[in-house]
Amino acid sequence: MAGGVGARVVVGRHIYGNLYGCDPQILRDESALITIIKEATKIANAMLLSVGSYRFGPNGGLTVFAIVAESHISIHTWPEYGFATVDVYTCGDHTDPKAAFDYIVSKLKPQKVEAFFGDRSMYKE
């Protein structure tokens, strides 16, 4: 049942957001974003399985992602607008997706953040 009715049998937490007014230089820095996403994985207490990235043109934005045993973490950037989106979804009581999200935000240094939370758990009556 949705909305947390009954006992939670599967734990899924999803925090995602829009970051405005980020430094375009860091949004173009593939190496820095990979380092940030690896550290965010540790902070979330998730098990890193793989990291990947894709650059959209020589000076364009990036998609950087971590596949973790518990789900995924991703950063998508639009440096020409100083804009990024961040997505952290983890399963399990042992993970802390908000801490990972907050860490990424601290590194991208946006002027404005819109954050959203989704409970993706399963509940049993």
From Swiss-Prot:
- Keyword Lyase assigned: yes
Instruction: Report the HAMAP family cross-referenced here.
Output: AdoMetDC_1
Task: Describe which pathway this protein belongs to, using the record's wording.
Answer: Amine and polyamine biosynthesis; S-adenosylmethioninamine biosynthesis; S-adenosylmethioninamine from S-adenosyl-L-methionine: step 1/1
Q: How does it assemble?
A: Heterotetramer of two alpha and two beta chains arranged as a dimer of alpha/beta heterodimers.
Which post-translational modifications are recorded for this protein?
Answer: Is synthesized initially as an inactive proenzyme. Formation of the active enzyme involves a self-maturation process in which the active site pyruvoyl group is generated from an internal serine residue via an autocatalytic post-translational modification. Two non-identical subunits are generated from the proenzyme in this reaction, and the pyruvate is formed at the N-terminus of the alpha chain, which is derived from the carboxyl end of the proenzyme.
- What's its job? Catalyzes the decarboxylation of S-adenosylmethionine to S-adenosylmethioninamine (dcAdoMet), the propylamine donor required for the synthesis of the polyamines spermine and spermidine from the diamine putrescine.
Q: What is the protein's name according to its record?
A: S-adenosylmethionine decarboxylase proenzyme
Q: Which Gene3D superfamilies did the record assign?
A: 3.30.160.750, S-adenosylmethionine decarboxylase domain
Domain of life (superkingdom): Archaea
Pfam families recorded for this chain? Answer: AdoMet_dc (PF02675)
**Swiss-Prot/TrEMBL keywords:** Autocatalytic cleavage, Decarboxylase, Lyase, Polyamine biosynthesis, Pyruvate, S-adenosyl-L-methionine, Schiff base, Spermidine biosynthesis, Zymogen
One biological-process term from Gene Ontology? spermidine biosynthetic process
Per the entry, the cofactor note is: Binds 1 pyruvoyl group covalently per subunit.
Q: Which reaction does it catalyse?
A: S-adenosyl-L-methionine + H(+) = S-adenosyl 3-(methylsulfanyl)propylamine + CO2
Could you state one GO cellular component term attached to this entry? cytosol
Any idea which residues bear Pyruvic acid (Ser) here? S71
The record's EC number reads 4.1.1.50
The answer to whether UniProt assigns keyword Lipid biosynthesis to this entry is: no
A GO molecular function annotation here is: adenosylmethionine decarboxylase activity
User: Active site: which residues?
Assistant: S71 (schiff-base intermediate with substrate), H76 (proton acceptor), C91 (proton donor)
Q: Which cofactors, if any, are listed as required?
A: pyruvate
Q: Provide the gene name from the record.
A: speH
Q: Where is this site: Cleavage (non-hydrolytic)?
A: E70, S71
Task: Identify its protein family.
Answer: Belongs to the prokaryotic AdoMetDC family. Type 1 subfamily.
